[in-house]
Amino acid sequence: MSSRREGRELALQALYSSDAESLGGTFALKKIMDNFADGSEPSLDVHGRSFTFATELVNGVLSNSEAIDRKIEEKSKNWSIARMAKVDLNILRLAVFELFYRPDIPKNVTINEAIEVAKKFGAEDSPAFINGILDEIASSLPDKE
C-alpha cells in the first residue's frame, strides 16, 4: 500500500475519532498512531511519510472545515451533511481538501483514492455515493497542471 493511501486511511480514522469522541484532530491522529506504535501493524509507517501526509490532511480539513462542508453541501443533492454517514462525510472532506488545496494531486487520483478508501471503510453503497458527489465537485474545477 502506498504511503499516501496509508496516510489517507489514518487521516480518515483520526477525523472519525475526532467526531465521535470530540477530540482535536491532531490529538486523535496521535492516539491512533500510538495504538500502532507497539508494532502490532509492522507494515504501518508510523513515523514516516504516511504519518506526515495524514497530519497534513487532518490539519487541512480542520482548518478549512466550513468551506469544505459548504462545497459538499452544495453538490450533494437531497443529502444534508447531518444525514450522511460519518465515514462517508469524512472521506468526502479529505477528498474535497485535496481537490481544492492540493494542486499537486490530480483530480482523478483524489477521486479514485477516495473510492478505494470508501470500499475499505464505508458501507456497500459508499463508493458510488462518494464518487457521485466528488464527480460533481471536480467537474466544476479547472484541470490541475
Swiss-Prot record:
Transcription recorded as keyword: yes
UniProt key word Zinc-finger: no
GO molecular function, one term: RNA binding
Cellular component terms (Gene Ontology): cytosol
Superkingdom, natural source: Bacteria
Pfam families: NusB
GO biological process terms held by the UniProt record: DNA-templated transcription termination; transcription antitermination
Keywords from the UniProt entry: RNA-binding, Transcription, Transcription antitermination, Transcription regulation
Function as written in the Swiss-Prot or TrEMBL entry: Involved in transcription antitermination. Required for transcription of ribosomal RNA (rRNA) genes. Binds specifically to the boxA antiterminator sequence of the ribosomal RNA (rrn) operons.
Family designation: Belongs to the NusB family.
Protein name: Transcription antitermination protein NusB
Provenance organism: Geotalea daltonii (strain DSM 22248 / JCM 15807 / FRC-32) (Geobacter daltonii)
